[in-house]
Amino acid sequence: MDVLYSLSKTLKDARDKIVEGTLYSNVSDLIQQFNQMIITMNGNEFQTGGIGNLPIRNWNFDFGLLGTTLLNLDANYVETARNTIDYFVDFVDNVCMDEMVRESQRNGIAPQSDSLRKLSGIKFKRINFDNSSEYIENWNLQNRRQRTGFTFHKPNIFPYSASFTLNRSQPAHDNLMGTMWLNAGSEIQVAGFDYSCAINAPANTQQFEHVVQLRRVLTTATITLLPDAERFSFPRVINSADGATTWYFNPVILRPNNVEVEFLLNGQIINTYQARFGTIIARNFDTIRLSFQLMRPPNMTPAVAALFPNAQPFEHHATVGLTLRIESAVCESVLADASETMLANVTSVRQEYAIPVGPVFPPGMNWTDLITNYSPSREDNLQRVFTVASIRSMLVK
């Protein structure tokens, strides 16, 4: 993996900097590094592909070295270099694709394709190493079973979940009270509602709670908490729990009271925030507990009182809600997030070449399925293929 990254980094630099008109002295170190890559690769043969519709390709390396000059690089010099660069880039691209479509239930962090296994040999260690990538750094740590740490922007840590629970229900579905939520990606939206606006509740107040367990521990998280759940702020028709009928939800939004958010790790409270909105932080946690109240307004203008009558029919439904969004966090496990395309890169290659479903990943690389059942085997394989995807993205967009 180190060699593959170093190859890709050298090729990217060469493609960007070995251009016509450049002073040789400005790229002499890069050309020496480029020549060392050629010397190391010459005389070797590789084979990639042969899984799904990914074609088998054979690769042979026999390239001349780039020479020295006292002047600027001319068109002939650059053309010679380009022919070599293009072949090497094509090779790295195919090695990456070959690796991204393979998986193993045991030691999935290790190279799985024949070509990458061969590149792991001692003879290729002479290629100049550059391990500045966060992915390659963490791959090395994971390969040695040491603690890793990935920084994510809007991490996709919550499996998709959209549902409701009813604390009070009637066959006619005309006087309901309960909670509905939508968890997806890095965001939780939860709403508590009461058709009667807590008229018969103790102290005219309804209490709601929403608990979300994460599949992996997050640390040093920056979080946004808002006293609203915009996805539940408009009328909708909702299927009943048994699917036999539907019921009408027509929300009127109130501000939640006594809002509290707790971040827990192994059942122990790490951070607690009460009635604090905007930006908050959490040190480390694997569970989020949100609690909030719907309080019937003690004083109402006639217009508001008309919305919340003392008896049925209840045509408008009192609703309070919260939005919690993880803006950034550190996780020991690799995740998909908003700032990278690794999941899309891997998935698109597997789809394009009709790669059969293997023993580790779910069909279509379904992220909700993958993160819901995030086994150690999936974690190892995902870190490997994301690392390879990050290497490929240096050369192929």
From Swiss-Prot:
Residues covered by region (Interaction with the inner capsid protein VP2): 62-73
Cell location: Virion
Major subcellular site: virion
Signal peptide region: none
Modified how: The N-terminus is blocked.
Transmembrane segments: none
GO biological process, one term: fusion of virus membrane with host plasma membrane
Family: Belongs to the rotavirus VP6 family.
Subunit structure: Homotrimer. Interacts with the inner capsid protein VP2. Interacts with the outer capsid glycoprotein VP7. Interacts with the outer capsid protein VP5*.
Protein name according to UniProt: Intermediate capsid protein VP6
Species the sequence originates in: Rotavirus A (strain RVA/Cow/United States/WC3/1981/G6P7[5]) (RV-A)
